[in-house]
C-alpha cells in the first residue's frame, strides 16, 4: 500500500464500503447487536459482540474464503479449460477439494436466489478495475465460475433454490486488485457495517422494552438416557 490510488480505485473502495454498511436486521452480526443490546449492556459490548459474529468465515470472512478458493483452483487445475473448472467445482461440492466443506464460496445467499443486487454493482466495476490493473484473465475466471456454479449446484442438489454470485464473490477480488492484504478484508467490512450496527442498536434502545429471548428447539436427535454405570 503506497498511499497512491486512481479515481477508479477510490470509487470502488467507496462503493464497497457503502454496499457493506447495512443489510437489514436479520444478518448474523446485526441480529447479534439487537440481542445483546436488549440485555441492557453498553455500546462497546454490543459492537464487540457484533464483531465476534462478523469474524466468522460464514459471515464477514466469506470473501477471504473466496479468494483462497480461487488460489487453490489456480494451483490445482488448468483454469483456461472450462471442463477442468467444472470438474473442480463439482469436487468442491463433493468435499474433495479445497477445505472439503462442500461449498462453492461466494455462490448463494440466505435471502437472495435470482441475484444479489450488491454483487451486480461490484461485478460491473470489477470488470473496469481488472482492465485497469491487467487482471482480465482472473476476472474472466471469476465470470466463468459465476456462470458454471449455479448449473453444477442445480445438478447436485435434490432440493434446489436458485443461487447466484453474492457480494462476497466479487468484494474479495476487488480488494485483491487493490493490493489489500486478506487480513484487512474483515476489518474493512466492520468499518462499513458499524454504521448499520449503530443504527440497529439505536432502534432497539428506542423501541424495545424486553430482552430478546427466542424459544429454542434442539437440532440434535433425542437420545435415550444411559446410566453412568452403563456408559
Residues of each region from the PLM?
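Non-transmembrane, aqueous-exposed alpha-helical and coiled segments at domain scale
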Residues: 1-231
Amino acid at each position: 500500500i503506497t498511499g497512491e490510488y486512481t479515481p477508479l480505485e477510490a470509487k470502488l473502495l467507496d462503493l464497497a464500503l457503502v454496499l457493506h454498511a447495512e443489510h437489514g436486521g436479520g444478518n448474523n452480526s446485526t441480529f447479534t447487536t439487537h440481542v445483546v443490546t436488549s440485555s441492557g449492556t453498553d455500546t462497546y459490548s454490543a459492537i464487540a459482540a457484533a464483531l465476534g459474529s462478523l469474524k466468522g468465515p460464514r459471515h464477514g470472512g466469506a470473501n477471504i474464503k473466496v479468494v483462497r478458493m480461487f488460489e487453490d483452483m489456480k494451483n490445482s487445475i488448468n483454469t483456461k479449460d472450462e471442463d477442468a473448472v467444472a470438474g473442480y467445482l463439482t469436487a468442491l461440492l463433493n468435499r474433495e477439494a479445497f477445505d472439503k466443506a462442500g461449498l462453492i464460496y461466494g455462490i448463494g445467499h440466505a435471502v437472495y436466489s435470482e441475484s444479489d443486487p450488491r454483487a451486480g454493482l461490484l461485478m460491473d466495476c470489477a470488470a473496469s478495475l481488472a482492465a485497469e490493473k491487467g487482471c482480465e484473465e482472473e476476472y474472466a475466471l471469476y465470470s466463468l465460475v459465476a456462470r458454471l456454479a449455479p448449473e453444477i449446484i442445480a445438478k447436485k442438489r435434490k432440493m434446489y433454490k436458485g443461487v447466484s454470485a453474492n457480494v462476497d464473490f466479487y468484494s474479495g477480488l476487488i480488494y485483491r486488485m487493490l493490493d489489500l492484504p486478506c487480513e484487512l478484508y474483515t476489518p474493512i467490512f466492520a468499518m462499513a457495517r458499524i454504521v448499520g450496527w449503530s443504527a440497529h442498536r439505536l432502534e432497539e434502545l428506542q423501541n424495545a422494552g424486553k430482552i430478546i429471548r427466542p424459544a429454542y428447539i434442539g437440532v440434535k436427535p433425542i437420545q435415550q438416557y444411559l446410566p453412568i454405570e452403563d456408559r
